[in-house]
């Protein structure tokens, strides 16, 4: 992926909102690394972009694999995707953990099992629930971005699942 100036059509990911956000996100990523979590970051090197990274608030897109949902204590607003693998018989408990967290902005599930889709969509208390698709929603500062509990700014942008 290409990280840099969002004004270029070839850019996949731009900067985060400010220096404080960058610091908090990078601290979270480092904490997960120090706990031994698998952390994957993907950015294609480009000399023009690399110059921008030095002065901007860029954070590389990051995937972190968690052993348990309980490892997340707060929402992370940035290009970070947390992946939790679970056994099928543990799904009800996982949904309960998500619902009990107090946060419920966005949840994504990828599965080919209709029963799993029904169980998640029927039980998860989140504002934005995406099934087998990318997890994008509203334009920040332009559209409301719905959530549940301590998350979101209003009703969900866009249509159904």
Feature map (PLM): residue ranges:
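Flexible, glycine/charged-enriched surface loops at secondary-structure junctions
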Residues: 3-10, 39-43, 106-112, 130-134
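Flexible, acidic loop-helix segments that line cofactor/substrate-binding pockets
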Residues: 1-27, 43-58, 74-78, 141-144
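Conserved C-terminal structural/oligomerization subdomain of aldehyde/semialdehyde dehydrogenase
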Residues: 50-161
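Acidic, glycine-rich loop-and-strand cores that form catalytic or ligand-binding grooves
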Residues: 36
